[in-house]
Amino acid sequence: MAETLTPRQIVERLDQFIIGQKEAKKAVAIALRNRYRRSLLDEKLRDEVMPKNILMIGPTGVGKTEIARRLAKLVGAPFIKVEATKFTEVGYVGRDVESMVRDLVETSVRLVKERKMSEVKDRAEQQANKRLVELLVPGKQKQTIKNPLELLFGGQASQPDNGHSHDDEQVEKKRRQVAWQLANGQLEDEMVTIEIEEQPPMLFDFLQGAGIEQMGVNMQDALGSLMPKRRKKRRLKVSEARKVLINEEAQKLIDMDEVTQEAIRLAEQSGIIFIDEIDKIARGKEVSGSADVSREGVQRDILPIVEGSTVMTKYGPVKTDHILFIAAGAFHMAKPSDLIPELQGRFPIRVELAKLSVDDFVSILVEPNNALIKQYQALLATEGINLEFSDDAIRKIAEVAFEVNQTTDNIGARRLHTILEKLLEDLLFEAPDIGLNRVVITPQYVEQKLGNIVKNKDLSEFIL
């Protein structure tokens, strides 16, 4: 189970995707393990143990967000990333800080719902296949009266059959044959007409911006249930229709009240909220006046959420006491001490992330499971091209990335995306027509494609 991973094992898992930043990985690994330790305590003490929130300090592109995202994915915890600059003080137009908790609960509901639907997938598939058989071999239509008032005007209700007719036996025989063909994948490309529930039109979205969202009420859900449900017909291949029907049947098999309760519990006990750009709402020396007051107001609004409070959502009240908050910022223009003292105290663990070196860039290019070079190799393999990079070429690319970051804005590892795209631009364009099955990238090729751009500072700023 991911919840029982030791801090060392968590760091090893994170190492598969993120290069360096040992201190930051260590801090989040301890925070995650402490959650597991807390779950083993008796209930009275468990409520007293609060998570130690983390403040990550470091330039953009060094792995702050990725560490938090991978951590959440590792344990299947609900995770959201928000930007502190998007929030406004209560009473002003814009998003209030409580919306981050509502977003977390939405993510949690989606996670739990997907998990529950995967648990009933086999049963849902059986029901979907039954419906497909009935659609492919429809039975004899019986006369039924949907409106009881028809009886007053001479209509007759359908009588139940006392036995099977010859036609019914033929239909059953045909259905058994079709069921066997479906099970053996012989009818995947056959066309079938299915009825699916149509989503009600989004009529009430305009109300959400008028403060309704802050009340924890979803007008679409509240008023949508009063509107009649419409069904529309779609003609699909059996393989596609099965997916639609499995989804419909799975929805019927899960209890949404149970999903909601579990989702709220998961968000409260395991949720992770990543607040980016928190340095932008700190009191910098160069900022004064109303903007400074507004920033401090947002900090004071964030404070009760981080301290622990109850937020109303459309799924019910959610306590934030045990949600793990990870804040991050570059802190170029401000210092962590420029945050209001109360908020500083709520982020007791501070980790400084190092700037990336040339060696870090080399490692980022080749070591992670999702390394950029591996991605480009996989993309070009679809065109029948075996793309290779010499070790010297990889180091040259890393040196170019480091140099451009030094001479222009430092955007960390994101610089590699721009550089590799520029380096391989011609190859990606010509790949379908080039007629080669092997291409080797050398230092000379890197110099040829990027050398002049790197030397010209103006070009670097615009192109790389």
From Swiss-Prot:
GO molecular function, one term: ATP hydrolysis activity
NCBIfam families, per the entry: hslU, PRK05201.1
Family as reported in the entry's similarity comment: Belongs to the ClpX chaperone family. HslU subfamily.
Gene behind this protein: hslU
Region (Disordered): 154-174
Gene3D superfamilies from the UniProt entry: 1.10.8.60, P-loop containing nucleotide triphosphate hydrolases (3.40.50.300)
A single GO BP: proteolysis involved in protein catabolic process
Subunit structure: A double ring-shaped homohexamer of HslV is capped on each side by a ring-shaped HslU homohexamer. The assembly of the HslU/HslV complex is dependent on binding of ATP.
CDD domains: RecA-like_HslU
Principal location class: cytoplasm
SMART domains recorded: AAA, ClpB_D2-small
Name the record gives this protein: ATP-dependent protease ATPase subunit HslU
Any one Gene Ontology cellular component term annotated for this protein: HslUV protease complex
